[in-house]
Amino acid sequence: MQNKIQGVYLVTDRPLCLHHKLEEVVQMAASGGVSLVQLREKDSTSREFLELAIHLKFILSPFQVPLLINDRVDLCLASGADGVHLGQTDLPWLEARRILGKDAIIGLSIETKEDFATLTKEDPNPQLEYLAVSPVFDTPTKTNTKEALGLAGVRWLKEKTDIPVVAIGGINISNAKDVIGAGADMIAVVSAICSAKNPKEATVALRNQF
C-alpha cells in the first residue's frame, strides 16, 4: 500500500468546511485526485463518527481512495475503513497492527527527534505505511502539538528512514512546493481543501505542485 503514500492527503475538519458540507468536500477532493483521506472529527460522538465514516467510505469507494480513521482503531474496524493515523499518545502502533492486520494502512505522527528514536529502538524496521512530520508549520487546526519542525524537520526525517514521509501542519498552495522539495512524499492539508470555494480545484492545484 506504500504506493498510495504520495500526492495529496486530506484531513477533515467540519468547522473549516466553509462553503460545502464535509461529504461534498470529500467527494470533490476525490474527483480532484486526492490520494488519501483521514476522518478526524474530535467533537463527534462515537455513533456520529461511525455513521460519517461509513458514508465517506461509500463516497470514496468509486475513486479507490483509502479512508483512514484518526486514533480510533475500534471505529476503523466497525466502519470498514482502510487504516488509522496514530499520534504519540494513542494506541501503540504494534497493537493497532495486531488488531487491524497486515493489509491495514497505519501512519504515525513524529513530532520530535526523540519520537523517532523511540520508534526505531523498539523496532529497527517498523511496519508502518508512513511517518508524519507534525507539524511542519504552526497551524490553528491543531493546538496540542510540539514546536513546528519546519522544512529542516522534513529533510531530517526523509534522510533517516525509507518509510514514506507525510508532511502536515500549516501546508497550503503557497508553501507546498517547498515542502515537497524538502522530501515529503505526501502533503496533508486541512483548510487548504476544506475551506476552499472549489475543493476539487484546490486539490488539483496542490497535486500540480509535485
From Swiss-Prot:
Cellular component GO terms, alphabetical: cytoplasm
Cofactor(s) recorded in Swiss-Prot or TrEMBL: Mg(2+)
Catalytic activity entry: 2-[(2R,5Z)-2-carboxy-4-methylthiazol-5(2H)-ylidene]ethyl phosphate + 4-amino-2-methyl-5-(diphosphooxymethyl)pyrimidine + 2 H(+) = thiamine phosphate + CO2 + diphosphate; 2-(2-carboxy-4-methylthiazol-5-yl)ethyl phosphate + 4-amino-2-methyl-5-(diphosphooxymethyl)pyrimidine + 2 H(+) = thiamine phosphate + CO2 + diphosphate; 4-methyl-5-(2-phosphooxyethyl)-thiazole + 4-amino-2-methyl-5-(diphosphooxymethyl)pyrimidine + H(+) = thiamine phosphate + diphosphate
Pathway in which the depicted protein is active: Cofactor biosynthesis; thiamine diphosphate biosynthesis; thiamine phosphate from 4-amino-2-methyl-5-diphosphomethylpyrimidine and 4-methyl-5-(2-phosphoethyl)-thiazole: step 1/1
Residues reported in the UniProt entry to bind 4-amino-2-methyl-5-(diphosphooxymethyl)pyrimidine: Q38, L39, R40, E41, K42, N70, S109, K142
Positions with a binding annotation for 2-[(2R,5Z)-2-carboxy-4-methylthiazol-5(2H)-ylidene]ethyl phosphate: T139, P140, T141, G170, V190, S191
Domain of life: Bacteria
Binding residue positions for Mg(2+): D71, D90
Keywords: Magnesium, Metal-binding, Thiamine biosynthesis, Transferase
Entry note: cofactor: Binds 1 Mg(2+) ion per subunit.
EC numbers: 2.5.1.3
Biological process annotations from GO: thiamine biosynthetic process; thiamine diphosphate biosynthetic process
GO molecular function: magnesium ion binding; thiamine-phosphate diphosphorylase activity
Record-stated family: Belongs to the thiamine-phosphate synthase family.
Function: Condenses 4-methyl-5-(beta-hydroxyethyl)thiazole monophosphate (THZ-P) and 2-methyl-4-amino-5-hydroxymethyl pyrimidine pyrophosphate (HMP-PP) to form thiamine monophosphate (TMP).
Matches recorded under NCBIfam families: thiE (TIGR00693)
PANTHER family membership: THIAMINE BIOSYNTHETIC BIFUNCTIONAL ENZYME (PTHR20857:SF23), THIAMINE-PHOSPHATE PYROPHOSPHORYLASE (PTHR20857)
Protein name: Thiamine-phosphate synthase
Originating species: Leptospira biflexa serovar Patoc (strain Patoc 1 / ATCC 23582 / Paris)
Taxonomic lineage of the native organism: Bacteria, Pseudomonadati, Spirochaetota, Spirochaetia, Leptospirales
Gene this protein is translated from: thiE
